[in-house]
């Protein structure tokens, strides 16, 4: 299923997973992608986004592991594939790559992360 990309591109309550730390981190990821969209030529902004994403994925995966979440391995693979894709992107970042990142985050939260609601 493909979910609608919000405009303006920002987190709202429809993305809530009901774990405060993860919701706050998701808000930061939306902001990081928006910042990159606003400054696609800035390699520093791209590097900050990659770091934010890696840190969030680590936190999320640690929560999953601590609760023996059954889909941890497949979730980690989805994360690592996205990080690998992002690390292949260079500044200036194309509109196509910004769109890809926006769509990936929205679809990942609503299509994949929502599966762990109430399980962590």
UniProtKB/Swiss-Prot annotation:
GO terms for cellular component: cytoplasm. Its main location: cytoplasm. Fe cation 2 binds at residues 60, 75, 79, 108, 113. Signal peptide: none annotated. InterPro entries: Haemerythrin, Haemerythrin_Fe_BS, Hemerythrin, Hemerythrin-like, Hemerythrin-like_sf, Hemerythrin_metal-bd. It comes from the Eukaryota. Pfam families: Hemerythrin (PF01814). Keywords: Cytoplasm, Iron, Metal-binding, Oxygen transport, Transport. It is found in: Cytoplasm. Fe cation 1 binds at residues 26, 56, 60, 113. The keyword Iron-sulfur does not apply. Belongs to the hemerythrin family. Myohemerythrin is an oxygen-binding protein found in the retractor muscles of certain worms. The oxygen-binding site contains two iron atoms. Monomer. This is Myohemerythrin. It comes from Theromyzon tessulatum. The lineage of its organism: Eukaryota, Metazoa, Spiralia, Lophotrochozoa, Annelida.
């Amino acid at each position: 299923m493909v979910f609608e990309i919000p405009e303006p591109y920002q987190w709202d309550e429809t993305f809530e997973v009901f774990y405060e730390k993860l919701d706050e981190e998701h808000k930061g990821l939306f902001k990081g992608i928006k910042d990159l969209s606003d400054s696609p030529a800035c390699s520093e902004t791209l590097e900050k986004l990659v770091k934010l994403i890696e840190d969030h994925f680590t936190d999320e995966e640690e929560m999953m592991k601590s609760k023996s979440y059954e889909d941890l391995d497949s979730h980690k693979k989805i994360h690592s594939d996205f990080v690998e894709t992002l690390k292949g992107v260079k500044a200036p970042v194309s509109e196509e790559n910004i769109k890809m990142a926006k769509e990936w985050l929205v679809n990942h939260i609503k299509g994949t992360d929502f599966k762990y609601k109430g399980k962590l």
